[in-house]
Structures are given as structure tokens and as C-alpha cells.
Regions:
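Conserved N-terminal segment of class I S-adenosyl-L-methionine
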Residues: 1-87, 103-107, 112, 123, ...
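Short hydrophobic-acidic sequence motifs that mark active-site Asp/Glu residues
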Residues: 70, 90, 118
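A short beta-strand submotif of the Rossmann-like class I SAM-dependent methyltransferase core
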Residues: 87-93
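Conserved residues at the C-terminal ends of beta-strands
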Residues: 91, 100, 120
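A short His-aromatic
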Residues: 96-97
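Aromatic- and Lys/Arg-enriched surface recognition patch
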Residues: 100, 128-130
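Short glycine-dipeptide loop
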Residues: 113-117
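Short "lid" loop at the C-terminus of a central beta-strand within the Rossmann-like core
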Residues: 122-128
């Protein structure tokens, strides 16, 4: 199970209240370089929020060569389960997954990813809450925990840890 119906309702409400997904646009240079080096064509922004990553990539002639798809269960029109892509981007998403669904989501991501990907994960509480009052980051774990968890499904090629976040190239 990728999410519960109750949580999907929380996501829909939250997306109506607030613009989510802005952080990934600032990572477009890093993602571009990694994806280009892997020779990919199709990129999936999994948990795309408002779609700022796709907008950032399409606004730059060098980056616009990629075919970019978006998936977010909380946004009508972006909530269809995606097909396999060469590369999967997951920025500020995994910490929002319901803990009981995380293993299924990681397995799903592994099936969707043909060549590689980029995951950026916050390790601290969010500044926002869900409409039901819970912190928007449902999983708050240190980088070491995430590295172990991701290593169960992916071959991590590079990672970096900063205060409050960790990033992994696959």
C-alpha cells in the first residue's frame, strides 16, 4: 500500500491550502548533471507537489531535453500511478510517507527506476502541519537510518549529509 485513503485526503487538503514542491527547483542543476551523466531521457518527479521541478527544467534550454513526468497522490491530474522511467527524483517526499507504507513506497520506486535517481530527505520536523494537526514529516529519522533503509532497495552511489537533510544518488 502506497498510502491510506485517510492520508490521501490530508494531502489533497494540504495542497489546496499551500504551495508544496518548491524546494526541488533549486536542485535542478545537480539533478540535470547526474541524469545527463547517466544518459537518461525520461525523468519522473515522484511527489512533485506544485511541479516546480518540471517548470525549472523546461525553462532552461539545456535541461529541457528530458521528458519529465509528475506524480503526486494529493493533486488531481497528477495522481495516476506512473510507469517506469529512466530516472526518479524524490525531493522532500520520503519523510512525508506514512511509516507503515514506506517499504511499499520504496519497492514501488525501485520498480519505477530504470537507471538511477536522486532522493533528498529532511531529517527534522517540518515547519508545517497536516490539516489533522500532525507534523507534515511523518518520518523523522537521522541520515544513517535513511541510508540503511534505502540500501535495502537501491545501490547508493553517492550521498551527502547536511544539517537537517541527507541526499542520495542512485
Amino acid at each position: 500500500m502506497l498510502y491510506t485513503n485517510e492520508y490521501k485526503e490530508q494531502l489533497i487538503l494540504k495542497h489546496k491550502q499551500q504551495h508544496w514542491g518548491g524546494g526541488v527547483a533549486s536542485k535542478s542543476n545537480v539533478i540535470y548533471a547526474h541524469a545527463l551523466g547517466l544518459g537518461v531521457n525520461k525523468i519522473l518527479d515522484y511527489g512533485c507537489g506544485a511541479g516546480d521541478f518540471k517548470k525549472a527544467m523546461k525553462s532552461d534550454p539545456w535541461k529541457s531535453k528530458f521528458e519529465i513526468s509528475e506524480y503526486d497522490p494529493g493533486i488531481h491530474g497528477k495522481d495516476e500511478l506512473p510507469n517506469v522511467h529512466d530516472y526518479v527524483v524524490c525531493v522532500d517526499v520520503l519523510e512525508h510517507i506514512e511509516p507503515e507504507c514506506l517499504n511499499d513506497v520504496l519497492a514501488h520506486l525501485a520498480l519505477l527506476m530504470r537507471v538511477g535517481g536522486y532522493f533528498l530527505i529532511s531529517t527534522v520536523p517540518a515547519f508545517q502541519n497536516l490539516p489533522d494537526g500532525r507534523n507534515a514529516h511523518l518520518i523523522i529519522e537521522p541520515a544513517e537510518w535513511w541510508e540503511k533503509k534505502l540500501s535495502e532497495k537501491f545501490e547508493l552511489t553517492t550521498h551527502y549529509i547536511a544539517e537537517g537533510a541527507c541526499a542520495y544518488f542512485i
